[in-house]
Amino acid sequence: LSDNLSHLEKLGLNLVIEGTTPEAVDEASDRQRFEDFAERCQLDMPRGMTAIDSEGVRKAVSSIGYPVLIRPSYVLGGRGMEILSNDKQLDAYMDEAFLSPDRPLLIDEYLGNAIELDVDAVCDGEEVLIGAIMEHLEEAGIHSGDSTCFIPPQNISEGVLSKVEEWTTTIGLELGIRGCYNIQFAIRDEELYVCLLYTSYAADEEDS
């Protein structure tokens, strides 16, 4: 989506694109750009790397160490996401994976024994409204569509919840989001991590 919108902008058609800009969508969707954004805003993320070929994937896994969470970049709804714990599982995943410079794989440190939160919010560029903070019953890494959630969260401290609200607001305002967005956080030992961000015209079409 962000590539298509950027192409329209380059054509110079004087189109008025309502909502989140292509630039903001790309910053949310591109791994390196979002990591740079998170560092500027002092938001913690799991260690992660990007790879465009098999050798790069294996180097990334070796550097990060098992278990890892691996997934394609720029996909809908977390398709192709797997938690890998050993070389045999990695070999099986790579047998099915398609990699290229414009279709990289994202390899992240898997935070075991972590609690996952799904946060839905909307931003108009000036204010952020948080619609729901959902706590996953399953441990972090299970796709949202396969998980069970509690609203409101049952096992999260007030301090962490306050930080979730603060980070959600920071992301919406600093990225310049105008519309809906979804953030997936992980909590381990009272430490908060940003794991995924979805933002576009539909709130679940792009991910970082």
Give the positions of each predicted feature.
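N-terminal beta-alpha lobe that positions the nucleotide/phosphoryl donor
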Residues: 1-183, 187-197
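Single conserved hydrophobic/aromatic residue that forms the stacking wall/gate
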Residues: 198-208
